[in-house]
Amino acid sequence: MKAVVRRVAYCIVLLVCIMYVSIGLFIYMPGISKGNVKQKTDSVEPVRPLFDHLDVLKKLRVDYVLEKAKEAGTAEIGSKPYWRWSPVGQVVDSQFRDSNTVLSVMPSVVENGGSVTLEWKNIPDPSPRTRSSDWIALFCPSSSPSNRYIDYWSVSDLATDYPSSSGSVNLILYNVRTDCEFRYFTNDTYVELLAVSNKVTFVDSTEAPLHGHLALTGDASQMRVQWTTGVQYTPTVDYGLCGSELDNTSKGTSRTYKNSDMCGPPANLSAHFIEPGYLHDVLLTGLKPNTRYCYRYGSPGFKYSSEQNFTSAIEPGSDIPFKFVMYGDMDTTLPPGSITTAALVKKEIEENGVTMLIHIGDLSYAIGLAYRWEMWMSLIEPYSVLAPYMIGIGNHEQEHIVGGEKDPSHAPGNGFHPSWGNYGHDSGGECGVPVYNRFHMPENGNQPWWYSFEYGLVHFTVLSTEHNFTQGSPQHTWLRNELSSVDRSRTPWLIVSCHRAMYSSEQYFVDNQVGEHIRHALEPIFHEYRVDLVVVGHYHTYERTCKVYREQCVEDGTIHVLVGGAGFILDSAPVLPFRWSKHFELEFGYGRVTVANKTALLWEFVRNRDRKVTDSVWLYH
């Protein structure tokens, strides 16, 4: 009898497992973001034209995106939540209802990132049925037509006493270098505009130097300073040793971009685009390595920033110990996500001696909604002006399916779309344009997509897994030449970062399949040139492997660290117990690296919610 029971139990468990896998295969179909499942292959398949291998579901999603591009005001909106469409179909001819509704915002003048109180009164018929379709939109400039709002909120999400004829909420506003106003809409039977708020302006609206950040060039005597204003001028940085006069001056260049510069919808539509202002870029030269400098940026006759400071780079080969931070997949989420990450990394710089950081792709999650770039750049500014903010490219900066001729990375066709992957439309048509114009990385590859630099005892190599990385591709050829030229007597530590992971215990089927192809293409090179550490993101979690090669723990392998929990929604996929996985946790946090000397390096994972180090490993030569 017991044997029969065991057999029945075994069959039930087997049936449940089969159902679970079947459901998983259905859930992670393309268009949801995890792609189509194909059999593992022993070789990397050549890249094909996109439409040669799209299955029916992905083709339908592509058609839907292209159809939306033809409609005014129906662009896909960022992550509110992830890839949510605008609250109504078209907001073109909204009627103004003659009502007593009042919408007001206070104060009417606000700093960048300042809080305002938005209040509404006398909403007609405040019942759940009629008010469930109410929404409030932000328009900048205030003269924008009703189909050109830059952000929106459902009233049911904002109001604590919903439904009611009145309500209020505190919101953070970001300086978009023009005036703004809010409008209250209802969409019960058709779109009606119930009320328009007073106008809001920003302190030093167009002159305010915004979004300041630093970048290394690979030369310890240099530092790059970048920022944004609403006015065009000769960008100027005054700098000097802290404690003395800022008696050195460097001038630079400026650039900007338009919605028409981007590859596809919604990014290239006018409906949710904000003029990014003038993006200024100044190179500081003649710096002493590993020295504290103070600086300010602006232009004579215009407003300057407050005085900031940074520590210049450590000269390559110097055995001075240093610390840096690495993370991926940030966004602008509430604690313990992005906002906590930003606050803790600022403390790392100010209190713990961190002098540099690397963001491994998926930066703002704007996905075509320009206002999210304003939000995210403002979030990182308090610490990106204190230490170089080096970046890599993720799928949400780069992936596109149309308009490839506008891709500033000059990827052929409409980008990288291998038949075995889930490369699609994840940038919302941005195709790298915002990040290319906002961040200037070292110019020894195809920056900001792939490049390298040296800092002290470490050689850093940054790759793009959103571009062709297979054998024979320009990036693959560059990588081999790049790693073969590293002088390990000068920079004994070799660290590679890219967005997508080779190793993950999470069961996102096609992302895992992509990882297998990355392993096939890149792992032999990493093993040949004895890469010490590979740091990645994409999966929104934390995981560390053993020294691994070809899925086996070996003494001469490479440690892979997945640190994709800087802020975006944490993953929820099942996790399998692979032998190469040494630590896994579903937590927000970031990586901290201490380069002690030529023979010892410490990796630590710092958990956001309590700032505890929950995983660490020493690497030795």
Spans of features found by a protein language model:
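Acidic, histidine-bearing metal-coordination/catalytic regions of metal-dependent phosphoesterases
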Residues: K2-P126, T130-G328, E350-E351, L586, ...
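Metal-dependent phosphoester/phosphodiester hydrolase catalytic core
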Residues: F202, T206-P574, W580-E585, R592-H621
